[in-house]
Amino acid sequence: MVKIGVLGLQGAVREHVKSVEASGAEAVVVKRIEQLEEIDGLILPGGESTTMRRLIDKYAFMEPLRTFAKSGKPMFGTCAGMILLAKTLIGYEEAHIGAMDITVERNAFGRQKDSFEAALSIEGVGEDFVGVFIRAPYVVEVADNVEVLSKHGDRMVAVRQDQFLAASFHPELTDDHRVTAYFVEMVKEAKMKKVV
């Protein structure tokens, strides 16, 4: 069974754990740097990205997270987690982990649309997935090596680049575990490659 970590500094940690377990993998709440060694994949949950960055800095997680990103093990960022994975953030000079060749805008759906739900069609996952958007970012631009998995209107809301997956919405806040299951499959495939 693959072991998937959920970064436990802030955000929808418990809901991600439930979704990972419902998808047939073991979930670990990561609160210490050395736990990164023990997992096969990592979820960066939604939350408030500036608060999360402050906590990442406080507990000296940034370099270990960048090292994890270079290790070939899959990472999945939802909402604030997508912001952490992006190489370029509109209005900000520096990236956080900066693992994905994407440009992201924070709070991109505007204050009047603080939160809403939308039925999404997601490549590799299926139709009618209810995306829960809460002060959500979205992907403004992608490099050629990034696959766009889903759009809401003309805005890119789910993308994949090799072992990295990012979503604007919160898949863990529904009882539909298909997006988490898709990530679990990515982790299984990456683990199989390492074994060979």
UniProtKB/Swiss-Prot annotation:
It catalyses: aldehydo-D-ribose 5-phosphate + D-glyceraldehyde 3-phosphate + L-glutamine = pyridoxal 5'-phosphate + L-glutamate + phosphate + 3 H2O + H(+); L-glutamine + H2O = L-glutamate + NH4(+). The keyword Glycoprotein does not apply. Its EC number is 4.3.3.6, 3.5.1.2. Keywords: Glutamine amidotransferase, Hydrolase, Lyase, Pyridoxal phosphate. The keyword Hydrolase applies. Gene3D superfamilies: 3.40.50.880. PROSITE patterns: PDXT_SNO_1, PDXT_SNO_2. L-glutamine binds at residues 47-49, 106, 134-135. It comes from the Bacteria. GO terms for biological process: glutamine catabolic process; pyridoxal phosphate biosynthetic process; pyridoxine metabolic process. One of its GO terms (cellular component) is cytosol. Pathway: Cofactor biosynthesis; pyridoxal 5'-phosphate biosynthesis. The active site is at 79 (nucleophile), 170 (charge relay system), 172 (charge relay system). Coiled coil: none annotated. InterPro entries: Class_I_gatase-like, PdxT/SNO, PdxT/SNO_CS. One of its GO terms (molecular function) is glutaminase activity. Belongs to the glutaminase PdxT/SNO family. HAMAP family: PdxT. In the presence of PdxS, forms a dodecamer of heterodimers. Only shows activity in the heterodimer. Catalyzes the hydrolysis of glutamine to glutamate and ammonia as part of the biosynthesis of pyridoxal 5'-phosphate. The resulting ammonia molecule is channeled to the active site of PdxS. This is Pyridoxal 5'-phosphate synthase subunit PdxT. The gene is pdxT.
